[in-house]
Amino acid sequence: MEPRDLALDTAVTRLKAAPGWYTANLPPGWNFLTPCGGVLMTVAMRAMQEELNDPDLRPLSANTHFCSPVPDGPLEVRVEVLRHGGAAAQIRAQLSSTTVPGPGLEVSATFGRVRQGVDVIDVVRPDVPGPEAAQRMDEAVGPGPRAKPLFFENFETRLALGHLWWRPGWDAGPARLMRWFQYKFPQRLADGRFDPLAIPPIADTMPPALIQKLGPDHEPFHAPSLDLTVHFLQDTTSQWLLTNVHARRARAGYATADLELWDDRGTLLAVATQMMMLRRFPAKP
C-alpha cells in the first residue's frame, strides 16, 4: 500500500446546513481492525480548528472518549465552541459515522495562545539508540491477516527499547516500550513545523507495552481505546518522534498506559494517557 497523507485524509469540509457541522471521508488506510482512534481524534480536532478560525490558537490539551466503533468512510463532526477568550478557547466535538449508527466519539479540547511564563522541564529523554541506529520494524508482526495493520504502512518505525513482541524466545520484563515513528508522508505545516494534530495517531499506539510484561506466550488480544488524553507541550521541525510508553496497570479486562513523545533533538513534545479495553480476538469460524 502506498503511504497515506494524514493531512489530506483527515481534512474536513464545512456544511452550510447548520453552524458547526463538518464532514470528512476517511479511507481504510488508517485502520487497525477499525480506524485508529487517534486518527479519528485528529479529524475532530481539524473541525475544531476550522470552527475557531484563529491561527494563533494552538492545541494545548484534548480528551477523547470513544463511545462506539466508527468505521472508515463518510463521517460527520458537530462542533460547539464553549468559550473563545483572549488567551484560550474551550471547544468540544462529536464525531460519528454517517453509515453506521452509534454515538462515535466525543472530544473536549483547549486551544491557547503562546504566552510569557516560566520554562522548566524535570525529565530527560531516555538514553536509547537514535532512529538511525535502532532496529527496523518494517515487517509483519505475526502470521495471518492481522500481521501488520494498514495503519503501520504509513510509518517508518524503529525499536528503541523492548522486544519484538510477535517473535518467540524472549523473556518478559517491565511493561515499557520505546519506538521511533516517522510518517512516510511528512506532516509539516506551511512554516515547517511538525503538525501537532499528527500527534494523536502516534499517541494511540500504547498496547504493545503491556505485552512486554506478559511475555511471548500471552493469549492474543486487541485493545480498543476507551479514552485518550494528549497534552501538547512544544513544537518541533523534526519528523522522527520517540514514544516512551509505560503500561502501569492491567486488571479486570482493562489497562492503563501513559506515553511521552520526544523528538530526535531531545525535546519533549507531548504527553498522553489512555484507558483501554482488553478483548480476545474473535474465534475463527
Tell me what each language-model feature is.
Residues 1-285:
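Terminal targeting signals and extreme-terminal segments of soluble enzymes
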